[in-house]
C-alpha cells in the first residue's frame, strides 16, 4: 500500500502480486463472478407464524427475565419483572420502553428464544438481522410479532441479511445470500441499500448504534449479567 500518512488509514494505492488493484478508494478489477457459495443457510421451516414471536406466560401476571439495554451501549443487565399478560402471553403494548428480542437458530436445530428487552429504543415495527456474532443466527428486536414474522420471512427469501418492517410493510432490506453474511454485489451497488437500511433503523430506534447492539446480542461472551 501507498499511504498519505503513517497511520495507514487512507491508502492511495493498493497492490496485489505486483498489480495495482485499487486507487483512491476504488477497486480497479472486475467484480467476482464465480457464483455464490454457502447459500440456503436459512433453515427456519420450524417457524410458522407471528405466534412464534410471542412469549407465553404461566399466570395472569407473568414474572419473566427482562434484558436491560444501555442506551447506545451493550446489553449489560437482566432483571426479573412482573409484566401484564393478555390471552396467556406477555403483553408489552402499554409500555413504550419494552420490546421483544428473539434469536432463532438457522443452522438446523429448530430452536428459538424470546425475551422482553427494556430501553433498546425501538417503539414500533421490527428489525431483523443474520449478522449476529458469533453464531449468526436470526436475531430480531420488535414491538409487533406480525412485523417480526414479515421480517423473518423476508430474510428467509433473501438468504439472510437485514430487514426493517413497520405496520406490515418492509421499509428496507439488505440481502446477504452468501451464508447470510455477504453479498456478491459490488460496493457501488450495495452502498445505497446499506444507507436505506440504516435510515430505516434510525427512524424506528432512538439509539444510533442499534444494528451494532443487535449484532452482538447473541454473543455468549457479551451476555447480560443477572442481577437478582
List the model feature ranges, each with a label.
Residues 1-228:
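Active-site microenvironment of metallo-dependent hydrolases
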Amino acid at each position: 500500500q501507498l499511504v498519505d500518512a503513517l497511520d495507514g488509514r487512507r491508502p492511495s494505492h493498493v497492490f496485489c502480486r505486483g498489480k495495482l488493484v485499487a486507487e483512491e478508494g476504488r477497486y480497479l478489477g472486475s467484480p467476482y463472478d464465480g457464483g455464490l457459495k454457502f447459500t440456503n443457510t436459512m433453515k427456519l421451516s420450524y417457524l410458522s407464524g407471528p405466534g412464534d414471536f410471542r412469549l407465553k406466560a404461566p399466570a395472569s401476571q407473568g414474572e419473566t427475565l427482562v434484558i436491560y439495554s444501555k442506551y447506545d451501549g451493550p446489553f449489560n443487565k437482566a432483571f426479573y419483572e412482573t409484566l401484564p399478560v393478555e390471552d396467556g402471553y406477555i403483553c408489552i403494548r402499554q409500555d413504550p420502553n419494552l420490546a421483544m428480542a428473539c434469536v432463532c437458530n438457522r443452522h438446523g436445530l429448530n430452536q428459538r428464544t424470546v425475551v422482553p428487552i427494556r430501553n433498546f429504543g425501538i417503539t414500533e415495527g421490527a428489525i431483523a438481522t443474520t449478522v449476529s456474532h458469533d453464531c449468526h443466527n436470526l436475531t430480531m428486536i420488535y414491538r409487533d410479532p406480525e412485523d417480526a414474522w414479515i421480517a423473518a420471512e423476508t430474510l428467509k427469501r433473501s438468504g439472510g441479511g437485514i430487514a426493517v418492517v413497520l405496520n406490515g410493510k418492509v421499509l428496507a432490506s439488505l440481502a446477504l445470500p452468501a451464508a447470510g453474511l455477504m453479498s456478491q454485489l459490488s460496493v457501488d451497488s450495495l452502498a445505497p441499500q446499506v444507507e436505506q437500511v440504516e435510515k430505516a433503523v434510525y427512524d424506528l430506534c432512538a439509539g444510533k448504534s442499534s444494528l451494532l447492539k443487535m449484532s452482538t446480542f447473541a454473543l455468549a461472551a457479551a451476555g447480560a449479567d443477572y442481577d437478582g
